[in-house]
Amino acid sequence: MKASTVIRFPFSVRRSVWLNKYSTFRIGGPANYFKVVHSASEAQQVIQFLHSHNYPFIIVGKGSNCLFDDRGFDGFVLCNGIQGKEFVSETTIKVYSGTSFSFLGKTLSSSGYSGLEFAVGIPGSVGGAVFMNAGIGNQDTAAVIESVEVINSKGEILSYNTEELGFGYRTSRFQHCNEFILSATFRLSRNSSSVKIAKDLLRNRLLSQPYQQPSTGCIFRNPPGNSAGKLIDEAGLKGFSLGGAQISPKHANFIVNTGRATSQEVKQLIQIVQDKLKSQGINLEEEVRIIPYQLP
């Protein structure tokens, strides 16, 4: 079904919602239809309906790794607002995907649980962390995942174990399908030093990354054995700007919105960086999720 087709939804939706309000980049035009779901049953109903009508849609969480188009999105944006957590054993916790990943890491480390200290300061949701296999250095989400619950195209809830999740460096199976991540179960351990570890990681992030300006975090994946930020800096592009988009003077793997950046300016800046590095024999892949106005 075309996104322009007038459709009657059997649930409440909002129309022409500006996506810049749902992106940490503060960029993006209006979505045709927009809905925040707060429960599994609500998500099941929406997903089943959209799939059965072959209606184009995307799933977003806190929008911390999304670059929306200036024109918006010609389709349905399903925003995940399902939050909550529960311990299923002394050191195993099930967390719903709309929960803040950073807040989860802070809460657990403050309570003496280790495993997710690295999450403190990562601005996305638990679902986003699973989707991207978020991490820092040699620590990532995959290392502490026990299982993930999803909602499939039929509205059914399925569970995947770690081996079925296709985890790799900043990647997972979910980047190649449109399954709705419902929850993740994490394996933790007890560690009295966890709160100090989390604080040290957060301090280093605040010192090295431009948290005061809108961005989506790292724009590029690190090439094997190297640092994208270091390579961009060495190429002389640190601080380079195009319109309202700028390669951060603080961390060269961040593009920041200095006030009125457009998605087109950000994409052009990404291309400039890629072309410059390619001339040196280095291919940089985007880590940011670039969402087109219309799905292919």
Swiss-Prot record:
PROSITE patterns: FAD_PCMH (PS51387). The active site is at 170, 218 (proton donor), 287. InterPro entries: FAD-bd_PCMH, FAD-bd_PCMH-like_sf, FAD-bd_PCMH_sub1, FAD-bd_PCMH_sub2, MurB, MurB_C, MurB_C_sf, Oxid_FAD_bind_N. Its cofactor is FAD. It holds the Pfam family FAD_binding_4. GO terms for cellular component: cytosol. Coiled coil: none annotated. Its EC number is 1.3.1.98. Residues 26-191 form the FAD-binding PCMH-type domain. Pathway: Cell wall biogenesis; peptidoglycan biosynthesis. Disulfide bonds: none annotated. Cell wall formation. Belongs to the MurB family. PANTHER family: UDP-N-ACETYLENOLPYRUVOYLGLUCOSAMINE REDUCTASE (PTHR21071:SF4). This is UDP-N-acetylenolpyruvoylglucosamine reductase. It comes from Chlamydia abortus (strain DSM 27085 / S26/3).
